[in-house]
Amino acid sequence: MPTKLTTTISKIASLPNSTNSALINEFHQYMKSNGASERHQNNNLKAVIAFANFLGTDTTFLDVQLKEQIMSFLDTKIKNVQEDPDKKWITTWNDYLHRIKHFFSGFTIRKM
């Protein structure tokens, strides 16, 4: 069963970094004001929340300057051949990449 948007939004407050929480809330408002569908909002928020959890308490989105920081997160989505013989993980990897790029290029750059 897919996660509802309200459930995803409630997870923002429990992130380990308050700066990232605030940026994700602003990103959500940005998507709403641009008329994004709830499904699009939900999927983007889930990806960005997962990345924020990966960054932990000491790193904010504003501190992310190297592509290697994003790549190390994306590489957690890679599965070995025994787990995923059809290499379906590539779709997940690309989906997260697209959503994180959207977050950084479409929204965060305007904030900086």
Q: At which residue positions do the language-model features occur?
A:
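Intrinsically disordered, low-complexity and often Lys/Arg-enriched segments
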Residues: M1-L5
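Charged interaction scaffolds used for protein-protein
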Residues: T6-A13, N20
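Short alpha-helical hairpin
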Residues: L15-F27
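N-terminal core-binding DNA-recognition domain of tyrosine recombinases/integrases
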Residues: T7-S10, N25-M112
